[in-house]
């Protein structure tokens, strides 16, 4: 019938979405109110609130729910009226409008993203066995430079988030401490994208809002050392399987077959052909941008 088979899934999904929409229309407003109240409390708590914000912000990264918290702190909380009478809300908007009190939810991210996480990457590099360091060095260098320049940290964080959750918990805790200390020191800094070196340099064009931003570099050096020491000790103490420290028996392919050299790619192609029964079993070979399509005589 029309409603059966492959058509049933989208039809049923649409129906259940309508039901869930009606339910959440009543359920979500109290939840939203609770989230907003929590955000208001974090703002009113001063340095402690900014520290809690930084800690929760990192903890929510794996789920993507950190964006809910970011929206409240960066675009809703607080109010600033400029000389023209325009009202600005949120830490980011108030900072770039010249509010000298803004930045408590941004300043402490600079030492972590520009210095702390690159320190963690260096620790993971030296924690890997010497023979595997060339394999992981390029990867760790690229994500560390990305974090330093742009403040995009997810590629680096996801390298150890699931392999070593303890390290990620420590990372979240250190992030909270950084925001707490930055607020206590009276540092007011901001970013338009993220807390990387590019935004740090552009921030100097806003002297009305930027205050004590040079202290972020001092904090950065300290947090680089803290991350390097803490990650190095914890990785070795608990034998965490960070990049390059995986058990050899868990490796599915050889280093040669996993490389981008001509020899490695030839070996990988040979393994694929053998896995589908050899060249005599192949009737047709086709490919698109995402898949390799093989038609075989004996499946």
Which role fits each region the language model picked out?
Residues 235-298:
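Non-transmembrane accessory domains of multi-pass membrane transporters/channels
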Residues 12, 125-127, 161, 285-287, ...:
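Generic beta-strand/beta-sheet core signal
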Residues 107-108, 129-134, 141-145, 190:
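Short, amphipathic, aromatic/basic-enriched membrane-interface segments that mark the entry/exit
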Residues 28-131:
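Helix-loop-helix hairpins and the membrane-proximal interhelical loops
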Residues 37, 41-50, 180-183, 287-298:
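Hydrophobic alpha-helical transmembrane segments and immediately flanking/interface helices
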Residues 2-6, 13-17, 42, 46, ...:
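Alpha-helical transmembrane segments of multi-pass membrane proteins, especially transporters
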Residues 1-74, 202-203, 210, 214-224, ...:
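Signature of multi-pass transmembrane helix bundles
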Residues 83-102, 118-121, 126, 142-143, ...:
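Transmembrane alpha-helical segments and their short flanking loops
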């Amino acid at each position: 019938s029309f409603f059966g088979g492959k058509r049933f899934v989208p039809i049923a999904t649409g129906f259940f979405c309508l039901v869930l929409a009606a339910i959440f229309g009543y359920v979500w407003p109290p939840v939203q109110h609770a989230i907003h109240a929590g955000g208001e409390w974090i703002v009113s708590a001063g340095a402690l609130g900014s520290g809690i914000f930084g800690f929760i912000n990192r903890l929510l990264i794996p789920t993507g729910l950190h964006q809910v918290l970011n929206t409240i702190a960066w675009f809703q909380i607080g109010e600033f009226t400029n000389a023209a009478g325009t009202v600005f809300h949120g830490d980011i908007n108030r900072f770039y409008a010249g509010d000298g009190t803004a930045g408590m939810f941004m300043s402490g991210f600079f030492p972590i993203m520009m210095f702390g996480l690159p320190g963690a990457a260096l620790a993971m590099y030296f924690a890997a066995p010497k023979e595997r360091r060339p394999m992981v060095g390029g990867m760790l260098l690229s994500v560390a430079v990305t974090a330093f320049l742009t403040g995009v940290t997810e590629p680096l964080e996801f390298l150890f988030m699931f392999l070593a959750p303890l390290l990620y918990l420590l990372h979240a805790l250190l992030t909270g401490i950084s925001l707490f200390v930055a607020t206590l020191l009276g540092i007011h800094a901001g970013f338009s994208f993220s807390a990387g070196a590019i935004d740090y340099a552009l921030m100097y064009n806003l002297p009305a809002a930027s205050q004590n931003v040079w202290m972020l570099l001092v904090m950065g050096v300290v947090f680089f050392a803290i991350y390097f020491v803490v990650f190095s000790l914890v990785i070795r103490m608990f034998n965490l399987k960070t990049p390059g420290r995986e058990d050899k028996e868990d490796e599915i392919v050889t280093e040669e077959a996993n490389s981008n050299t001509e020899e490695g790619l030839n070996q990988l192609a040979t393994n694929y052909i053998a896995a589908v029964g050899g060249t005599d079993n192949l009737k047709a070979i086709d490919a698109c941008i995402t898949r390799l399509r093989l038609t075989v005589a004996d499946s």
